[in-house]
């Protein structure tokens, strides 16, 4: 399908769905009483149609993902709340996201009190939980931490972005089994701390993780988030760190060390229009943010900036990203840069759609990519639809 047709399809899709009555697209979660507890089943799905312009691949492509999120919850008169919840996903190779295609993305027990939240199980770390970045029209297809990408390695059929995925939020402990604590917000300040004993994705301490050199253990993450009003504007900012210990090390390998920060400013021009801008930065000794490639010599740095303008249910945005992974033993120096322009429309609390254009460029100081060259240029026009159960 020619690029022009994809562009027209994206524009027509946004226009058509924007005319649909909002109330018709609100999906409520299924809720069933179980004794004194409540069982709630939520879900979400995303689907993309796009036309990638890349070496070795042509024509229209599609990708998508589906998630089910059951939660069993019990609230007590004392203010204590207990729940057991999970996220179970199915996706194709271009929508594997930051959890690398895990079927079980989250499965954790949680206790909530006036003193904060405690989680035990497969869940995100403190840094990722409190992360702040620039505004995103559609987080699912953003340059930063996307769920869906548009480019496929013609040899492996996996996402090209597996080479170096830009994720500026601190997240060294991924969804490894862990203990996590998040404080309540006090005077705009919120704190979080997490500990993952291993890289295993079971209950903490039950498994040592994958049998690979440089395997990480004892990963601590800490984060602080601050929110305040600056006159009519609102500001959010965060900073985070992660530190781990390497096992079965090769020469030069060490425990992962991760630092990151981000901020976002929202300014309401009037009752209908809001201008937003922000960004985030991360640096790590993990080559291309692969924690099993953490080396004493070599740093990976990534930055992301974006701005967006919202008008009622519409949102237009522009994103820029850049990443550099220093050369380490067995891996070349990698450079990545990206640019994205997008337009989105929120149909209801359960449905939204976006379309846009994205460019990614990669380069390396030795060897070649699948196109036989040390440079790789990619771009795509896309249409992306999001559906989810409403929390309202």
Give residue spans per PLM region.
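Outer membrane beta-barrel
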Residues: 29-49, 57-200, 226-229
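Membrane-embedded beta-strand positions of outer-membrane beta-barrel proteins
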Residues: 41-43, 84-86, 118-122, 191-193, ...
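Detector for outer-membrane/organellar transmembrane beta-barrel domains
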Residues: 222-341
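Outer-membrane beta-barrel "beta-signal"
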Residues: 376-392
